[in-house]
């Protein structure tokens, strides 16, 4: 599963020609026909909702109101009760910001969702295409609407402190003001129809999978706080809290997290979570080491912490650490900039470096997951080619989930399965829906991006197959993508190298043909946690320059190519950074490389061997031999799947 990349502003480059001289253009996203794009594209009439919101804005003396996508924890994925931007605008994509003035409304989103937004927004809304020349950013549009000393409002829990500070400084230049509106105005419009917050039980994540007790993790965090001379750390990111306390939840679909905050000081540990969500096992697990407090008490307690600290130490009081992703509301509760030091979270940094137990779990769960994928693709080919069955994309995705669920330690999926046939594969974040999705065409490319949550790890894998006869064009595109996968997988680099620097290794073969893909190459992956995990990754995001790749990092390796209206190709493996031995050690520093753990065959009939170097050909054959050795025993009583796996892992040659 992938992150987006900012749209490229330069003109599209004409593409290579295959042996058959058919043109392969650079991807033009989202011009796919509505009948093939499965998201419900029905326009929502927002007139009544906007009218009510504007009444509330006037009551609160606000001229412009901002509605972000995020929740109070700045989560990438949110619970239904936090879908405020979708409710007010009708746009259901995962990324975007809505801005409403007393007379206008605008929705800003990125290139993944331009088509979807244009279909879902009614005529009350203006679409701001992020990164496209001629369209203002949402901040610029907001500033323009606020000219003349107007007041801009936002729920301070839904915007980062740095984001609020930046916007406030911009608004001040034209005499306008940013204010925090404590009561969320969209919630008031939503009223009783707003989904209730989830009340799922929290569960213990055993140390045999976590690899370290939560007491050890907190002790290490306190050492970090001491080295920074900090008064404490207020934790707001849900995956960081789950990891720190060795707990998991089910409050957000596909993400095993639970709504909570935490405060860690040199002498106290407090977890803010609704007590009725804690089982006796969780209570016993936390014991006397952790004080449980009501979820909603965090803001008042943060304020009290800050006041107490100032009274005890006066002007020399040390500051509280706060993640640079934490909300403006939390920062204000702690006394604002003067009392807070915004940092990249030390918990996030520690979580990204998996311990030996977590790494072993990732290896093990990917073997089981690979066996599930092998069974699935063998089944799918048999249904489509031999039985001539009619299957739609959802039927196939459901079958994959059913197969995965048979394996040990399976908990659920790690994201919505992207099961896409033909041109649907060119839609980056395609999500098939029953009743509107496509029938799988055995004579077209099939792209499947899927993943699962297991107690011992999280998986994320993309495979692209063709169950008929691929064209020379498709084979060339697929092989260029495969060369990129191998390029990153086999990289050797000095300690201190960033994912930003490594990105070119996966793109180089497409670049040589004047081609590219408009998403990141790789993202961090949690250990039975979020499938997207920072701060590390491989791509062109500025944040990927900040933290170098380190041993124990687990990331995806997923270059792709997308021919709009025809097909999409992506190959994704999970790789783990480790120290490697080199002939020399320039600079007397460690050198790093990667270990791949994904164990699913790569579509053999899509590979054009003549485009591979001898080393790349050896990599493919070695990889397929490894898959056979590690997974064939799963099929001792399934001769068809075993034969399919044997065929798909046979050596290839030029």
Curated annotation (Swiss-Prot):
Binding site for Mn(2+) 2: 449, 460, 572
Co-factor(s): Mn(2+)
Details of cofactor binding: Binds 2 manganese ions per subunit.
Chain residues that bind Mn(2+) 1: 460, 558, 572
UniProt enzyme class: hydrolase
Keyword Manganese: yes
GO cellular component, as recorded: cytoplasm
Gene Ontology MF term list: metal ion binding; metalloaminopeptidase activity
EC number: 3.4.11.9
Keywords: Aminopeptidase, Hydrolase, Manganese, Metal-binding, Metalloprotease, Protease
PROSITE patterns: PROLINE_PEPTIDASE (PS00491)
GO BP of this protein: proteolysis
Pfam families: Creatinase_N (PF01321), Creatinase_N_2 (PF16189), Peptidase_M24 (PF00557), Peptidase_M24_C (PF16188)
Reactions this protein catalyses: Release of any N-terminal amino acid, including proline, that is linked to proline, even from a dipeptide or tripeptide
Family: Belongs to the peptidase M24B family.
Task of the protein: Catalyzes the removal of a penultimate prolyl residue from the N-termini of peptides.
Name of the protein this chain belongs to: Probable Xaa-Pro aminopeptidase P
Organism in which the protein naturally occurs: Aspergillus oryzae (strain ATCC 42149 / RIB 40) (Yellow koji mold)
């Amino acid at each position: 599963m992938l992150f987006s990349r900012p749209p490229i502003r330069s003109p599209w480059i004409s593409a290579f020609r295959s042996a058959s001289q058919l043109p392969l253009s650079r991807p033009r996203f989202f011009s796919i026909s509505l009948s093939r794009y499965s998201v419900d594209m029905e326009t929502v009439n927002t007139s009544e909702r906007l009218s009510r919101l504007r009444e509330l804005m006037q009551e609160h003396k606000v001229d412009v109101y901002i509605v972000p996508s995020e929740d109070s924890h700045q989560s990438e994925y949110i619970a239904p009760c936090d879908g405020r931007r979708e409710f007010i605008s009708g746009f259901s994509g995962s990324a975007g910001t809505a801005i409403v003035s007393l007379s206008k409304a605008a929705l800003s989103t990125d290139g993944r969702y331009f088509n979807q937004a244009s279909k879902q927004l009614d005529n009350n809304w203006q679409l701001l295409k992020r990164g496209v020349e001629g369209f203002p950013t949402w901040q610029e549009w907001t500033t323009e609407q606020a000219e003349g000393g107007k007041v801009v409002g936002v729920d301070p829990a839904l915007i980062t402190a740095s984001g609020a500070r930046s916007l406030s400084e911009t608004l001040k230049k034209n005499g306008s003001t940013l204010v925090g509106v404590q009561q969320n105005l969209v919630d008031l419009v939503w009223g009783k129809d707003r989904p209730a917050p989830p009340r799922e039980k929290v569960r213990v994540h055993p140390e045999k999978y976590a690899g370290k007790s939560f007491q050890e993790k907190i002790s290490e965090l306190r050492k970090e706080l001491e080295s920074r001379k900090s008064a404490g750390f207020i934790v707001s990111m849900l995956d960081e809290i789950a990891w720190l306390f060795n707990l998991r939840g089910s409050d957000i679909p596909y993400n095993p997290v639970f709504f909570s905050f935490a405060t860690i000081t040199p002498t106290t540990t407090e977890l803010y979570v609704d007590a009725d969500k804690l089982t006796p096992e969780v209570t016993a697990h936390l014991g006397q080491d952790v004080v449980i407090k009501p979820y909603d008490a965090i803001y008042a307690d943060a304020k009290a912490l800050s006041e107490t600290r100032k009274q005890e130490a006066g002007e020399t009081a040390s500051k509280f650490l706060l993640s640079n992703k934490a909300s403006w509301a939390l920062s204000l509760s702690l006394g604002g900039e003067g009392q807070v030091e915004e940092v990249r979270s030390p918990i996030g940094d520690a979580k990204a470096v998996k311990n030996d137990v977590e790494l072993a779990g990732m290896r093990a769960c990917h073997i089981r997951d690979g066996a599930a994928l092998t069974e699935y693709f063998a089944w799918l080919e048999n249904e489509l080619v031999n039985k001539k069955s009619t299957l739609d994309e959802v039927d196939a995705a459901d079958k994959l989930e059913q197969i995965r669920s048979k394996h040990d330690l399976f908990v659920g999926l790690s994201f919505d399965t992207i099961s896409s046939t033909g041109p649907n594969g060119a839609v980056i974040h395609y999500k098939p829906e029953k009743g509107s999705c496509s029938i799988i065409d055995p004579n077209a490319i099939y792209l499947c991006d899927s993943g699962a949550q297991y107690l011992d790890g999280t998986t994320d894998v993309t495979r692209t197959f063709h169950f008929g006869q691929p064209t020379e064009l498709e084979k060339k595109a697929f092989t260029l993508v495969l060369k990129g996968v191998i390029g990153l997988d086999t990289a050797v680099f000095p300690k201190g190298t960033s994912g930003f620097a490594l990105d070119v290794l996966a793109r180089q073969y497409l670049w040589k043909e004047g081609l590219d893909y408009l998403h990141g190459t790789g993202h961090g992956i949690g250990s039975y946690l979020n499938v997207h995990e920072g701060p590390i990754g491989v791509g062109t995001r500025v944040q990927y320059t900040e933290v170098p790749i380190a041993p124990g990092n687990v990331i995806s390796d997923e270059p792709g190519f997308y021919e709009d209206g025809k097909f999409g190709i992506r190959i994704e493996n999970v790789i783990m950074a480790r120290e490697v031995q080199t002939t020399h050690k320039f600079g007397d520093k460690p050198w790093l490389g990667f270990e791949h753990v994904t164990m699913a065959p790569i579509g053999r009939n899509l590979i054009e061997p003549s485009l591979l170097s001898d080393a790349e050909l050896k990599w493919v054959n070695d990889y397929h031999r490894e898959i056979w050795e590690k997974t064939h025993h799963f099929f001792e009583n399934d001769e068809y799947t075993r034969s399919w796996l044997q065929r798909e892992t046979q050596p290839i040659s030029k």
